[in-house]
């Protein structure tokens, strides 16, 4: 009855994991699907509830269809924030190169509260800091005009890969996880080099580049392995968007670049939140806060850096590479499902994480190294509680 009368009930605010178990366990028929004029996030919750119920009933294929619908609808809501078509125009001289560089990020508290759909419903709080490696920003992008050919050349120094993009169709093939050039293709599309995002209309990519005045040569360098847990992919995407912004005179500020990075990751179907890109493109240590809603633009509160830079504390911090990597997509998918289903244990932990970020903010403001260190330990336990893969045996062996 609650499900049938969803407009006047709290059904979609309940623990939908438990509801799915009740429906499947008692062989109850699923309620009618929600109409298209229902709130988008409610339809997202409905699709994931159906997916979980069908999965428990052993109807795997139908469950996967509903799960894909849930993620697709959330993607739709986030992409609506970026459907402002662009008019890229050449903003550099023929012999100029745009060079974008970014640090990576470490989050100290509140990680995961930046992830949709949690942040869309409740907002998020994250404390993170931008870091260089050996004094150099490890993520770099170079863009220069190509006057000889009216197409786009993509190169990766660290991967030793190269690809020539000559058509809109080739540029649109960016949602293949693991492709070396998914990020630059999606960034160029968002910048207006694809009909879906361009104000003008052209018969082909070649025609658009002729009107633009040149082809493009894009070179990427990532001095950090993907899957290292430092926000590499998101920050590389933000760096690419920033470089394209300068090259094409798009007029985006850092907040807009951060927002479009969130959209780019939805285009790639990798998902993800906002803390990685803002952690990298905004320097120093900061508290990032958002409110509920589809537009996730963080308020930035800068924090003093004494506990990280003063001589008495610098040796207390160590960044250690374990050699273990994980791609974010699979990790995100499982945790996001719990958010969709309003799983009580997930939501309670995320609320604790959100408050924990404010506690960390106070400790750093008070310049208390002991309290900050204790709270980092709390962050570690919270991350393990939410994601069991955070601390595999090989990592625990390093700690021991």
Give the residues covered by each predicted segment.
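Conserved acidic
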Residues: 232, 253, 345, 349
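Helix-loop-helix module between adjacent transmembrane segments
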Residues: 187, 226-228
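Flexible, acidic active-site loops/lids enriched in D/E/S/T/G that coordinate Mg2+ and/or position polar
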Residues: 214-220
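C-terminal nucleotide
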Residues: 1-210, 221, 259-271, 277-400
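DPxDG-like acidic metal-binding loop motif
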Residues: 228-250
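Inter-helical turn/loop segments and adjacent helix faces that build the functional surface
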Residues: 247-254, 297
């Amino acid at each position: 009855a609650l499900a049938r009368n969803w407009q006047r009930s709290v059904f979609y605010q309940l623990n939908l994991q438990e509801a799915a178990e009740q429906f499947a366990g008692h062989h109850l028929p699923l309620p009618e699907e929600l109409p298209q004029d229902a709130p988008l996030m409610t339809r997202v919750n409905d699709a994931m509830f159906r997916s979980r119920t069908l999965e428990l009933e052993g109807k795997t294929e139908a469950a996967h269809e509903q799960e894909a619908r849930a993620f697709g609808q959330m993607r739709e809501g986030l992409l609506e924030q970026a459907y402002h078509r662009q008019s890229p125009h050449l903003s550099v001289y023929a012999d100029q190169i745009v060079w974008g560089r970014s640090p990576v990020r470490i989050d100290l508290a509140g990680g995961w509260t930046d992830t949709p759909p949690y942040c869309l419903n409740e907002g998020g709080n994250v404390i993170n800091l931008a870091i260089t490696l050996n004094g150099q920003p490890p993520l770099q992008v170079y863009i220069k005009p190509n006057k000889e050919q009216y197409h786009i050349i993509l190169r990766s120094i660290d991967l030793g890969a190269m690809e020539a993009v000559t058509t809109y169709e080739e540029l649109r093939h960016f949602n293949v996880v693991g492709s070396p050039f998914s990020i630059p293709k999606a960034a160029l599309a968002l910048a207006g080099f694809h009909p879906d995002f361009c104000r003008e209309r052209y018969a082909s990519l070649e025609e658009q580049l002729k009107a633009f005045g040149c082809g493009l040569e894009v070179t990427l360098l990532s001095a950090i392995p993907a899957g290292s847990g430092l926000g590499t992919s998101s920050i590389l995407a933000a760096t690419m968007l920033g470089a394209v912004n300068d090259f094409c005179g798009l007029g985006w500020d850092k907040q807009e670049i951060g927002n479009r990075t969130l959209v780019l990751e939805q285009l790639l179907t990798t998902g993800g939140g906002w803390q990685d890109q803002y952690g990298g493109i905004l320097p120093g240590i900061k508290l990032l806060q958002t409110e509920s809603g589809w537009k996730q633009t963080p308020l930035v509160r800068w924090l003093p850096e004494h506990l990280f830079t003063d001589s008495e504390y610098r040796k207390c911090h160590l960044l250690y590479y374990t050699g273990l990597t994980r791609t974010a997509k699979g990790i995100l998918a499982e945790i996001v499902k719990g958010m969709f289903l309003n799983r009580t244990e997930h939501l309670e932990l995320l609320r604790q994480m959100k408050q924990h970020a404010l506690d960390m903010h106070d400790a750093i403001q008070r310049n208390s190294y002991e309290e900050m260190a204790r709270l980092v330990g709390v962050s570690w336990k919270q991350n393990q509680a939410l994601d069991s893969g955070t601390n595999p045996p090989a990592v625990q062996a390093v700690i021991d």
